[in-house]
Amino acid sequence: MANPQNRVQTERQQNNSSPYLRGDEVHDDPGIALSVFALQEIIRKVRESQTSLRNEGREVNPAPPEIEQIFSALRHLRDERPYRIERTLPTYYRFESSQSQERFFRVDSHFERIAAPVDNATLEEPARLMSLVSRRVDAIRDAGSFLLYNAPTHFVDGREIIDADGLGVDVSGPASPRRAEGASPATRQIDQLTVLNQDQEDTMVDTYPGACPDAVFRVHRALTAHVVHHQRDDYRNAMQWLQAYGEYKRIDFSRSLLTDVFSPDTVYIQSYHVPANPQLLWEVPRCGIPNLRAKRVLGVPHGTYITPNPRITSITIASRVTTTTSFAQLLGTIPTAAQMDDVRKIYLALMFPNQILLDIRSEPGHQVDVVAQSVAGVLGKLLFSYGPALFNITPHTPGPLIVHAPLSCKWQPMIRRTIRHGPSGRPLDFVITQGQRAFDCNQLAQNPARGNGYAGWGVDAVGDHPTPYPHVRRRIQYLGYVPEDVIDERFCGDDLRYPLHQTMCEALAISGHVNERNYVEMMRHDHVVRFAHLSQVINRDLVSALSLPDERFNMLAAVFPRDATGPDGPLVLDISYMAIIHAFRLRFLPVSRPERIIYQPMLESVYASHLSLAKLHANNLQTFVTANSESFVEARPLDTWRAVYPRLPEPVRQIFDLTGQHSFVTGSDIGLWLRSPLVQDSLFLLCARTAWQAVDDPADIGFTRDVYIHRQPIPGYPLEDVRQFRRDAVYFTNMLEARPANGNRVILDRAIMQQRAGAGRLRMSIRELLDDGLFVQIGIALRPNYFEHPSRLPPEETLRALPFEYRARARNGPTARVTLQMLRPVSAFFMLYNADEQAFPDEMIDLVPKMSLVSLYIQQPPVERVSYDTALSVINRDFVSFRSRVRLMDLSAAFDAGSQYALPSNAM
């Protein structure tokens, strides 16, 4: 069949089919086209209004920018691991060569890193000295927080031997082939360090000896033992809880990808324990409002504001082309941006009953709209709850609503109606009589004890239902309906009623507001479904560890009539009358689940874990301060918290700052919180708790109290036999081998030194004691020490540096003043003598011998003179290393509840 030919349209046909009207034809049209053009303009205006309403009604991300940043940082904090994977032991000991072929020196490299030089000015401020202690404890924790994996080995005579670079000792000195005399003993010792292949808890590991300081080894041993022996129970408990969490939140959680957790070739490392302890989150001082804001960000879903069926308005209050009823005038308006902000406040308060309350914003006299006030008075009663268990408005809000609600009942003119006022003069104390019918408006008066006059009247608004969190069992049931029973509009039916609705319809009908009564009746189903969605959001999406505990929630309702405000709130938001009208007409409909509901358990656990770390640091630091009060004479109660607070992670610190924005946190609040025994277990806490054991021996963190002033001449040795002098590896140090005998030691405590300094006789007193050859101990305070290893004689300021500062201050009057500061860092130095073969015998003799004024005692000195037989004596620890065929997997990324693609990440 041939293709038909295209017909050419005439000009008249083109005009008739044109989607737009042409200007000259409109001008010449007798009227029909003009009417169509006008109708198009009307439709365009209507569509613009609908588009504006839709844009305003689209709900944006409810998270404020600062809260959004906090939770983003918390999520990144989740990726931080409290451990690191090492193949070999870090180098803790190194060797310094000497001119001797038999002796050399072993230096504790870890002590060098810990005992770094500090500023003198920081020691007199207790908070800064506490910060120094915390930093050194953290350095021990970081040094010991490692797991060994795939240790390097080799075979000697069929035995598996650990490589020399995996021992924790830099053996390049004593085991070097250049030292022909001593290389053989050191090499033989290393060849005896056999690796044992073991099976611990169905995990393949290698056990071998190594060198490590005691404080660091304790942390490493505790971390390794926990990963090997205890992680599977933690994993099982976390999986069971996450399964229950997913079922409650109506999200799918699949652990099909984690089925090999009990495999001998896989080790899962769980840095954080799930779930978080809610009591720990709620014992933070004044945390009610910050937790409320955080909970809002975690659980409020994205949604939109929709209008009910337009036929409801058209067949009730807007059935005529022109109408003058108050409802018809207001329900046809478009909300402004400011009014939509108030609508969001209203729905936010409905999602957080008792915690967020609404108050009517006062308006200037020239802006008062009596019609809006009267309509808001009626609709506000249908929208808000005012007892007995739920409150959405403040005690001051019912006053304006009650004053204006009767206007709607009195404005409608009616011949056969009588209004009889009561004796009290209250706004609702009147009776409407119509024939034999009568309605007492006192039924609509508020009563917080029973909820009269508002949506919570005569309904069971709070039920009991178990949740994944033990501190929350309440189930909010606005209007008395279980949300799951009525939320599906297709099957819930049309007979959903509640007491206030029936009473309000009766009041509107008897007062002559028949159209308004019909509107409220037709809106009943939409209203019930509105609250069903809100109840579901509260009971499902908003339930978290940050939810207000049941007893505190009930306490807010109990103290509500007294208009009391406490640390838990309530938070008051102001709204306008027009916002109430628009909130009743617009229904909040969730369109997507909250984004953070998937990793909410991990965020809660991360936050609780770092709170526990802060408590651990503060409590242990306070114990250290109490045990060494001589070093912290001017310490104040909150100095420990001031030292710990700056070391908190940034997002945790920001949440604490949110607390200070709403309520003043006192020292008593902080003290009560720190004394609480509640903690959230984690690998961070395990390592930190073990690291704090180092302060039992202050030398482990580079502190000592055995500091003495004593004249110790630096010897000048005659070089009669240069070869023997070199062979002996002669050295000088101000570190004593033992404490001075009691008969040769004098202690000058702080009180004695202050007394003699005030009299201007401190130097004289110390000089007399030094002339007698005594060791003068300057107090019993702990002082930080640092290690120096100069290649030649230390400078004069190091040799003569005193552990205290005593100087006269400028005189501004007849009284002399002195400054006495007891705490100064002490240098522990070590100097090796080197002799040239062509040196004269008196090469090292000085006519005026140098003096070292300060001596100190360290139980385990950081430097020792050793031989080839004793060089490796520090290799006395047994280490466990995971074999290369074992996979180390971190579980932090796999604890995103509801994500079927949450895979454990490689820990290497």
From Swiss-Prot:
One of its GO terms (cellular component) is viral inner capsid. Residues 1-25 are annotated as: Disordered. The gene is Segment-2. Belongs to the orbivirus VP3 family. It is found in: Virion. Keywords: Capsid protein, Inner capsid protein, Virion. Coiled coil: none annotated. This is Structural core protein VP2. Pfam families: Orbi_VP3. Residues 1-19 have a biased composition (Polar residues). Its main location: virion. GO terms for molecular function: structural molecule activity. InterPro entries: Inner_layer_core_VP3_Orbivir, Inner_layer_core_VP3_Reovir.
